[in-house]
Amino acid sequence: MRYAIMVTGPAYGAQQASSALQFAHALLNEGHELISVFFYREGVYNANLLTSPAGDEYDLVRAWQKLNTQHGVALNICVAAALRRGIIDDTEADRLGLPSANLQPGFTLSGLGALAEASLTCDRVVQF
């Protein structure tokens, strides 16, 4: 089956993102296809390059990046939610006159259209 995941919780302080990542790995291990992960609302914090967890904590941001690198899963974050929360790529930093970007490599700023497209092309969309 083809899946898409929507994550609405931050990397730390809530369970949604961690559960979503575990679910993603379970899908792939069972031979399912994971088309994309869409990060919305507080979920956009999963794409913050500047996140620095304590040494004894799991690095969820880099784990999402590894999922993208190893399995080619698209990691889309809602551009409107990201801008409101200070997550920007180089293009937006230039456009807004900000000194630098902080979007973790492997993540892409996108609109809700990416979620709609995934909904149309997948068998299941699961929200965390």
Swiss-Prot record:
Keyword Transferase: yes
Chief location of this protein within or outside the cell: cytoplasm
Cell compartments where the protein resides: Cytoplasm
Any Pfam family matching the protein: DsrE
Gene Ontology molecular function: sulfur carrier activity; sulfurtransferase activity
Protein name, per record: Sulfurtransferase TusD
Catalytic residues (positions): 78 (cysteine persulfide intermediate)
Native organism: Salmonella arizonae (strain ATCC BAA-731 / CDC346-86 / RSK2980)
InterPro entries on file: DsrEFH-like (IPR027396), Sulphur_relay_DsrE/F-like (IPR003787), Sulphur_relay_TusD/DsrE (IPR017463)
Biological processes, Gene Ontology terms: tRNA wobble position uridine thiolation
Family: Belongs to the DsrE/TusD family.
GO CC annotation: sulfurtransferase complex
Entries under SUPFAM superfamilies matching the protein: DsrEFH-like (SSF75169)
Function: Part of a sulfur-relay system required for 2-thiolation of 5-methylaminomethyl-2-thiouridine (mnm(5)s(2)U) at tRNA wobble positions. Accepts sulfur from TusA and transfers it in turn to TusE.
